[in-house]
Amino acid sequence: MTYALLKKIDAPADLRKLDRRELRTLADELRAYVLESVSQTGGHLSSNLGTVELTIALHYVFHTPDDRVVWDVGHQSYPHKILTGRRERMNTLRQFGGISGFPRRSESQYDTFGTAHSSTSISAALGMALGARTLGEQRVSIAVIGDGAMTAGMAFEALNNAGVYKDLPLVVVLNDNDMSISPPVGALNKHLARLLSGQFYAATKKGIEKVLSVAPPVLEFAKRFEEHAKGMMVPATLFEEFGFNYIGPIDGHDLDSLVPTLQNIRKRALEGAGPQFLHVVTKKGQGYKLAEADPILYHGPGKFNPAEGIRPAAKPARKTYTQVFGEWLCDMAAADKRLIGITPAMREGSGMVEFEKRFPERYYDVGIAEQHAVTFAGGMACEGLKPIVAIYSTFLQRGYDQLIHDVALQNLPVVFALDRAGLVGADGATHAGAYDIAYLRCIPNMMVMTPSDENECRQLLTTAFHQNCPTAVRYPRGAGQGVATEAVLKDVPVGKGVMRRTGGARSGQRVAFLGFGSMVHPALGAAQALDASVADMRFVKPLDVELVKRLAEEHNYLVTVEEGSVMGGAGSAVLEALAEAGIDIPVLVLGLPDRFIDHGDPALLLSQCGLDAAGIERSVRERFGIGQAPVAVASRVA
């Protein structure tokens, strides 16, 4: 495709110069460009193919960037990026030094609010609308939110707050495409089904059908009206109760419907008609049959040939940590009927598909509702069950108060299986699990574990399951070390690390690495060159203080290494232990620096942070003057 029309669009102002009849052609070109781009770089696909017409209509009608558009989650923002001057940079999408896969304020004036976690858009758009009013500026703020994100309480908190302002130019666009990563769940999604399956409705319907059976054309009309009513009745009532003027549902792929509807909405909003709620229905994967047929497979693919589609991948030589967790979960559930599996809408990503199939009565997907997931697990634990909350490290941040107040304060035995701990690569800083060690180890009663390989992950999960306190096991995204897992469900001694290498003293300056989780193996690589000792600490809390003291006594220098924030992390725990013991020894703390790490290849990012074997070795030599002329060492003394 030549993209003749699309190449003329470098900003929404160019788009608004087009005749409305040209928008259909533009949509076809834009959809093809999204498919071509994502197939070459990897990224989110299904959601972006579904928002092409909506994106065009929004930028065609609203005066962006003066009018503010906030994209909830933001993984559906590729058409937006293409239309706002980043078309030629799509080949750098989610790559180191390239454009982000999510809206980013530093990237474009059209990215009015940075997003990546769900359900934040309405709050942000409301703040912008009231901010504009405070400044005496007239503009419209628009939140575009998916049906999956509408399961989160934060979205309803914002709706409840927004409805108070009866003349505020705020627009909420519900992109109803059934596209949370796992199917949306909960009462909101089932409310209409309950209403339409009730006894009164069934009896009324049966009676009407009996009366109208003598007039088939009228009966057919009634059936069509019923289908329309199913989409209209409950949403209108619900959102109007919040103080919004509800419009819809309308076809989110029909530009002839979208454009005039949005024009009317903008006009009414600026005339003081108050908050507007537009319900659009879109199809995930629209226009690419393979993605339409399997939108979950095409939710976030890697590179692929669009003509062939995603081919079955060869079985990897090494299991991922997510697979290790999924297998352990099924094995542990078979061994102990108290086990309950909980996920906040991340069944596939957290490795729970097989568990749901085998133990459906013990599987709970609570929707995109992390706060609820944590407290819900606490309630389960109160009844003597053993809940496992499978959650990404970055998403547990959303349930932090519940973690402290509802679980740890009551010392409830909930296991948090923290996937995506550390750097995650292409998704960047918004999805990095950089802070869990720091924010977990400060909580009383909490136990924190960091496995260094697949078998240790299985063992520490088993150990966590058998504790009578809240526990967290953090493990990284991607493949493990290739270590075979034992079939037996085996515990390890709580609070005890193990030595992986005992170094000599070739240099006369003995170094000991205290490795946590994924950093044990890079530390082993550095230790070979330095002839250093390496401890696999396994536990951040309770820390193996005796091992720390022994290593301090037997070595000249200690080096802690973790794939987490150095501020308040495992290295800080070691320094605290040394201070408590009154031990004075130079300590080098290595981990993720005090800044947000951008997107890119994980190995490259670790290298940039000095957390590969070469970087660790270099840091040790520079800090302690090993292998070079002696230098004064500004020791970090505990």
Curated annotation (Swiss-Prot):
Positions bound to Mg(2+): D147, N177
Pfam annotation, one family: Transket_pyr
Gene Ontology CC: one annotated term: cytosol
Reaction equation(s) it catalyzes: D-glyceraldehyde 3-phosphate + pyruvate + H(+) = 1-deoxy-D-xylulose 5-phosphate + CO2
GO MF annotation list: 1-deoxy-D-xylulose-5-phosphate synthase activity; magnesium ion binding; thiamine pyrophosphate binding
Cofactor binding note of this UniProt entry: Binds 1 Mg(2+) ion per subunit. Binds 1 thiamine pyrophosphate per subunit.
Role of this protein: Catalyzes the acyloin condensation reaction between C atoms 2 and 3 of pyruvate and glyceraldehyde 3-phosphate to yield 1-deoxy-D-xylulose-5-phosphate (DXP).
Subunit structure as annotated in this protein's UniProt entry: Homodimer.
Descriptive protein name: 1-deoxy-D-xylulose-5-phosphate synthase
Lineage, uppermost ranks: Bacteria, Pseudomonadati, Pseudomonadota, Betaproteobacteria, Burkholderiales
